[in-house]
């Protein structure tokens, strides 16, 4: 193999090794993004900054795995946090002008989210 070929192989190898690994979204990120929505979802406060968090979450959940993780976190929160208006939770994406491929509900089957 000539020297130029070896250099090309080395450069490609370095690019593969140095490529950053994309990490999946976490429940911490999901809850952090949606924390401003809690008062609204409990009927105790305005929508306020909630939609900014919803939009940030949608932008963060780019892969199927991310969307399934986000769905699972939201499903768990919807069932565990007392006083949440589940109708408002389900309508949150449309209220904020975004689309998500699942309903925010304790009954959502997150394994089917694409």
From Swiss-Prot:
GO MF annotations in UniProt: lipid binding
Superkingdom field: Eukaryota
Tissue spec: High expression in leaf epidermis and shoot apex, and also in root epidermis during seedling germination.
Transmembrane portions of the chain: none
A GO biological-process term: defense response
Keywords on record: Disulfide bond, Lipid-binding, Pathogenesis-related protein, Plant defense, Signal, Transport
Disulfide bridges in this chain: 27-73, 37-50, 51-96, 71-110
Main function: Plant non-specific lipid-transfer proteins transfer phospholipids as well as galactolipids across membranes. Binds cis-unsaturated fatty acids and jasmonic acid with a higher affinity than linear chain fatty acids. Formation of the complex with jasmonic acid results in a conformational change facilitating the LPT1 binding on the elicitin plasma membrane receptor that is known to be involved in plant defense induction. May also play a role in wax or cutin deposition in the cell walls of expanding epidermal cells and certain secretory tissues.
Protein name as it appears in the record: Non-specific lipid-transfer protein 1
Organism ancestry: Eukaryota, Viridiplantae, Streptophyta, Embryophyta, Tracheophyta
